[in-house]
From Swiss-Prot:
Lineage: Eukaryota, Metazoa, Chordata, Craniata, Vertebrata
Gene3D superfamilies in UniProt: Leucine Aminopeptidase, subunit E, domain 1
Encoding gene, per UniProt annotation: MACROD1
Domain Macro residue range list: 141-322
Leading EC class: hydrolase
TM spans (from-to): none
A Pfam family of this chain: Macro
Compartment annotation: Nucleus
One annotated Gene Ontology cellular component of this protein: nucleoplasm
Regulation: Subject to competitive inhibition by the product ADP-ribose.
Effect of residue 174 to A: Slightly reduced ADP-ribosyl hydrolase activity. Reduces O-acetyl-ADP-ribose deacetylase activity by 93%. No significant effect on affinity for substrate
Name listed for the protein in its UniProt record: ADP-ribose glycohydrolase MACROD1
Length: 325
């Protein structure tokens, strides 16, 4: 077998194995008539003549070209693959880098960065449909009709909202968005300083409005910050409208970012002084009416309370807005 035949056979083997990156350089004098040329671009040399014709693929792509196509298409090459640098959220000072890094992770990979290990998955949170089986409250004339599907979209939970693994949690913030007391401070401490760094770029928030940030070290992917009204004593009509707007503005962001689960704390009922019973009526009416319009766009709306008295209030009022079907 001639040297030319042996080289051609070896080239075919290398191409089949996906290991051909550059064409072999023939030794002088062994391939009579082979002419070495260089293309007009900055590309690699091409080998013409009998050797060059035999080295071409059926599609007319030369040996080097086939290797280049392989690299472009992601076929095996010897070039090392670029790997995204891992970010340590406990020490990082770049919120943009950290936020981008987290977006590229799967749900399972994100767990490594949670501030807690005892987080609560969405599937572990019972729906109102499940919870209502043990509710003794009977409503003779509920305000709304029975709807099994809506009862599967709403939940009441007494828990630490910072530990919920949902798409977003809502923060009852102050207008600065830089952290404060109550649930606001808890969320900022759990998420870490990167949350405050991103909030600083939002330049405050008006009462009744909402803004969204990453969740960072929280199990929740996002935090929706809203500012409730300050209402000591009997709330005015405008304050009631502002509280309703807090929930609607937060839900608007949920849809805008295509998120499907969200947990709300009790907004304005802490240091802002809004009466718990009056707030519950607004919250339940707002969520019920919103779900009637958008039930196919979300999986769960969670009312997450921290105090037993708030749980009792919502448990007694839920049947009026979400009658047991």
């Amino acid at each position: 077998m001639s040297l030319q035949s042996r080289l051609s056979g070896r080239l075919a083997q290398l191409r089949a194995a996906g290991q051909l990156l550059v064409p072999p350089r023939p030794r002088p004098g062994h391939l009579a008539g082979a002419t070495r040329t260089r293309s007009s671009t900055c590309g690699p040399p091409a080998f013409l003549g009998v050797f060059g014709r035999r080295a071409r693929t059926s599609a007319g792509v030369g040996a080097w070209g086939a290797a280049a196509v392989g690299r472009t298409a992601g076929v095996r090459t010897w070039a090392p693959l670029a790997m995204a640098a891992k970010v340590d959220l406990s020490t990082s000072t770049d919120w943009k880098e950290a936020k981008s890094f987290l977006k590229g992770l799967s749900d399972k990979q994100r767990e490594e960065h949670y501030f807690c290990k005892d987080f609560v998955r969405l599937k572990k949170i019972p729906t109102w449909k499940e919870m209502a089986k043990g509710v003794a409250v009977k409503v003779e004339e509920p305000r709304y009709k029975k709807d099994k599907q809506l009862n599967e979209k709403i939940s009441l939970l007494r828990s630490d909202i910072t530990k919920l693994e949902v798409d977003a949690i809502v923060n009852a913030a102050n207008s600065s968005l830089l952290g404060g007391g109550g649930v606001d401070g808890c969320i900022h401490r759990a998420a870490g300083p990167l949350l405050t760094d991103e909030c600083r770029t939002l330049q405050s928030c008006k009462t009744g409005k909402a803004k969204i940030t990453g969740g960072y070290r929280l199990p929740a992917k996002y935090v929706i910050h809203t500012v409730g009204p300050i209402a000591y004593g009997e709330p005015s009509a405008s304050q009631a409208a502002e509280l309703r707007s807090c929930y609607l503005s937060s839900l608007d962001l949920l849809l805008e970012h295509r998120l499907r689960s969200v947990a709300f704390p009790c907004i304005s009922t802490g240091v802002f002084g809004y009466p718990c019973e009056a707030a519950a009526e607004i919250v339940l009416a707002t969520l019920r009416e919103w779900l009637e319009q958008h039930k196919d766009k979300v999986d769960r709306l969670i009312i997450c309370v921290f105090l037993e008295k708030d749980e009792d209030i919502y448990r007694s009022r839920l049947p009026h807005y979400f009658p047991v079907a």
